[in-house]
Amino acid sequence: MTSKTILWSIEKNQQLLETRGVSFEDVVSAMERNGVLDDIPHPNQLRYAHQRVLIIEIEGYACHVLYVVDGDTMFLKTIFPSRKAQRLILRRNDDEVEN
């Protein structure tokens, strides 16, 4: 998906693995498998104008991955599951079944 170098905090990655059962390695794997559903600006542009949000399917569930880009580097900030984005996955899967 990207030719950028992808970086993240080791401590944050460990915290996400312990608290949410998902890691930045899962994000990279999903990106390699074309699991990126969307790439949007952060919804709060006043406060986080520099951030973007990847919507990624990880193990069948949609997650938001907040990140920033600095030159050729993509720095992953956090991951959280998204019920709203999950509905998009379900709708997409329903459309595929119908076709």
What are these regions (language model features)?
Residues M1-N99:
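Ribonuclease/tRNase effector modules and their secretory precursors
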